[in-house]
A protein has these predicted regions:
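Membrane-integrated ABC transporters
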Residues: 1-35, 47-59, 63, 76-84, ...
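An intracellular "coupling" helix at the cytosolic face of ABC transporter transmembrane type-1 domains
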Residues: 104-105, 121-130, 134, 138, ...
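Transmembrane helices of ABC transporter permease
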Residues: 13, 17-30, 61-71, 132-186, ...
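Short active-site loops of ABC-family nucleotide-binding domains
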Residues: 85, 105, 113, 117, ...
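ABC-type nucleotide-binding domain
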Residues: 328-588
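Pre-NBD coupling/linker segments of ABC/ABC-like ATPases
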Residues: 316-330
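Helix-loop-helix
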Residues: 50-57, 150-164, 234-307, 312-313
Length: 588
């Protein structure tokens, strides 16, 4: 029940407001008891006793009590509603802050739609609990107990007979609670799955349309939607079958009153006014019984939701800030791998990797798909931790560096470019929000993006869609590169950043990068040798191993993997030029 304690820790901030609200609920419940008494007095004293002068006063009291109750109800509803909004705001902020601290492994294991449902649907169930269920449950319990006490004060025998219903009510309540929770657990799971599927399909709509798979995705959505509908219907059928039981129990009280009350009035044990009074209190007993099923239903929704939110909140990241942080605001940029082994589950990704890079050097990384290039870069940024060996930046183990310091000194243009739904300027300035427009433009020029940006309708103020919709692959890569450059980092990482750019544009970008790379360490992951031919050292990875290392000339001399790739790529290029030249002579 740790999730309940966690929930109460948020509720504590609003305890004064909640206590005031509960006190007002208590006063309102007391006022509810007055009108049945007045109804009985009207029957006994006004109608039967013929004291007609009392009728006006009694009616004014009833009206006054009703007005005061309405005012108090409005006040305590505002107390609970404001508390619920504040609590959910705090909880959502804390949950989102927790999400921002999670590592890559967490997001690899959890789908975006699942996490979104925690922040929306589950949070709304918590809000409903605080704004409605708490006061409603408290009010119903108070009204039930007070009405029972008042019936005892009117006629003990009648009250004892009505108590016969309580054990049956308790049994039905416990039975409903036992059966409804698994049903609501399934509802929340199905909702998360549906939400995740919809989010994934919408995000990948271009692929869906490119492969004409709309009908296929619609069928999959129908299955998810059917599952959610069936889960909802199953939960509804469980709690709805208990509603008639509570109705029957409440009607039993009415039957007891009619039978016993009638005999007591005939025998002179009760007056008609007493019976009218008891009938008024009977409504107060019946109403909580009728509402019990709904309250349990809402309570189980809340418990299911808060448990799922709590699971996300209590998930500890694998990558944590070190206990004894080495503080160093500006890094020089040297990088060292010492016998690094890295694996995920049972799959070895990197095996015994060792190399050293001096500050200001440019390092090219090449290898077949799946050889471990991106994983190697991820270890420098400490997106993951090594299983054996060490990764050092400025001769400090990255596990001892402050994460913000480490990543703040690294500018990375990722292979999978992500751009926010913002202006182009906002996207480029993401890593350095305090920069000037001139700095943004300078970074764009280095990335060879300034020209196409200025040609856009609003220039740098052009709003680009989510994930850069509306831009070509090469344009997105250049904006991503400009974003990494503008951060002014000690280490720049380009993860296949120019794969969607033509060779002429790539050459222009490389020339611009050379002007700033003397004071920065640059890692370039590439499949095209032209992207790394100028590097101070080139790392060749094959199946997770560092099989070759050296300059372009040194690696060609080894006649190994690098040499093979080079001659293959440039051989194809030479053949292409030869065919084109022959075609040109033929046309002449």
């Amino acid at each position: 029940m740790g999730y309940i304690r966690w929930f109460l820790s948020f509720l504590k901030k609003y305890r004064v407001r909640m206590i005031v609200g509960l006190i007002l609920v208590f006063i309102t419940a007391l006022l509810v008891l007055i009108n049945p008494q007045i109804s009985g007095m009207i029957v006994d004293e006004v109608i039967e006793g013929q004291h007609y002068e009392k009728l006006g006063i009694l009616l004014l009291i009833m009206i006054g009590v009703t007005l005061v109750r309405s005012l108090l109800r409005f006040t305590f509803l505002m107390c609970f509603e404001s508390s619920s909004q504040g609590l959910v705001y705090d909880m959502r902020e804390e949950a989102y802050r927790k999400l921002m601290k999670e590592d890559f492994n967490f997001f690899n294991k959890n789908r975006t739609g699942d996490l979104m449902s925690r922040q929306t649907g589950d949070m709304d169930a918590v809000r409903h609990m605080v704004s409605h269920v708490i006061y409603f449950s408290f009010e119903n319990i108070l009204v039930f107990l007070m009405a029972l006490v008042m019936i005892f004060s009117v006629n003990v025998k009648m009250a004892l007979c009505m108590l016969i219903v309580l054990p049956f009510t308790l049994a039905v309540t416990l039975s409903q609670r036992r059966h409804i929770k698994p049903a609501f657990d399934r509802v929340r799971d199905c909702f998360s799955s549906l939400n995740a599927f919809a989010q994934e399909t919408i995000a990948g709509n271009r692929v869906v349309k490119a492969f004409a798979k709309e009908d296929y995705e619609l069928e999959k959505f129908d299955r998810e939607n059917d599952g959610y509908r069936d889960a909802q219907l199953n939960a509804a059928s469980i709690w709805m079958k208990y509603i008639p039981m509570f109705e029957i129990l409440s009607q039993c009280l009415t039957i007891i009153l009619m039978i016993m009350g009638g005999f007591m009035v005939i025998d002179g044990e009760m007056t008609i006014g007493n019976m009218v009074t008891v009938n008024g209190y009977l409504w107060m007993l019946n109403s909580p019984l009728r509402q019990a099923g709904w309250i349990i239903n809402d309570l189980q929704r809340f418990l299911t939701a808060i448990e799922k939110i709590y699971k996300v909140y209590t998930t500890e990241p694998d990558i944590k800030q070190p206990e004894h942080v080495v503080e160093k605001r500006k890094l020089k940029g040297s990088v060292t791998f010492e016998h690094v082994n890295y694996y995920t589950n049972d799959d070895t990704v990197l095996k015994d990797i060792s190399f050293h890079v001096e500050p200001g050097q440019t390092v090219g990384i090449i290898g077949a798909t799946g050889s471990g290039k991106s994983s190697l870069i991820n270890l420098i940024c400490r997106f993951y931790d090594v299983n054996q060996g060490r990764v050092l930046v400025d001769d400090i183990d990255v596990r001892n560096l402050n994460l913000q310091t480490l990543r703040g000194n690294i500018g990375i243009a990722m292979q999978d470019v992500f751009l926010f739904s913002d202006t182009i300027e906002g996207n480029i300035a993401y890593g350095n929000p305090d920069c000037t427009f001139e700095q943004v433009q300078a970074a764009a020029k280095i990335a060879n993006a300034d020209e196409f940006i200025r040609e856009m309708p609003e220039g740098y103020d052009t709003i680009i869609g989510e994930r850069g919709v509306g831009l070509s692959g090469g344009q997105k890569q250049r904006i991503s590169l400009a974003r990494a450059i503008l951060k002014d980092p000690s280490i720049i990482i380009l993860d296949d950043t120019t794969s969607a750019i033509d060779m002429e544009t790539e050459s222009m970008i490389q020339n611009e990068l050379k002007k700033i790379s003397d004071e920065r360490t640059v890692f370039i992951i590439a499949h095209r040798i032209s992207s790394i031919i100028h590097a101070d050292q080139i790392l060749v990875l094959d199946n997770g191993r560092l099989v070759e290392r050296g300059t372009h000339e040194q690696l060609l001399a080894k006649k190994g993997y690098y040499s093979t790739v080079f001659h293959h790529q440039y051989g194809e290029f030479d053949r292409f030029k030869k065919v084109r030249a022959e075609k040109g002579r033929g046309e002449a």
